[in-house]
């Protein structure tokens, strides 16, 4: 399968202001990804996955204190690509090496909730097993 690359030009987690730009959205915390293919707006489930959301937002804003020195003070996701694209299933990003094995230099535990992957636009952490979350995420297509 031909790999499609979509550059993440800017990822900004919007705590406020998203409702001004997108009045159709329910009140909440959103991530706004600006890509070469257009805008992707994702709702972040802060109440159900507070550690995961705090990690994602702090990486996006360049304020994560746990990152490896090379990423310190930088908006981690800016300029990264979706390195894994599976048609009719999902896109995966958040890896600075674009290989599927890179990360921010630390790992954190899983948060299990009643959230499911039952439709398009679901955002989840991508990992290599229990307790291996870092920066990689995927977004479902269907």
Where are these regions (language model features)?
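Sec-dependent N-terminal signal peptides
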Residues: 4-14
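Cyclophilin-like peptidyl-prolyl cis-trans isomerases
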Residues: 13-142
């Amino acid at each position: 399968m031909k790999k499609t690359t979509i550059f993440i030009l800017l990822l900004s987690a919007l705590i406020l202001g998203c409702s001004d730009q997108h009045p159709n959205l329910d009140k909440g915390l959103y991530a706004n990804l600006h890509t070469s293919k257009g805008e992707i707006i994702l709702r972040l489930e802060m109440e159900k996955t507070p550690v995961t959301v705090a990690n994602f937002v702090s990486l996006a804003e360049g304020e994560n204190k746990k990152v490896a020195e090379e990423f310190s003070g930088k908006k981690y996701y800016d300029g990264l690509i979706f390195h894994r694209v599976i048609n009719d299933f999902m896109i995966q990003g958040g890896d600075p090496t674009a290989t599927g094995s890179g990360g921010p230099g630390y790992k954190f535990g899983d948060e299990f909730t009643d959230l499911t992957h039952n439709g398009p636009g679901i955002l989840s952490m991508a990992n290599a097993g229990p307790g291996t979350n870092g920066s990689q995420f995927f977004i479902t297509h269907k």
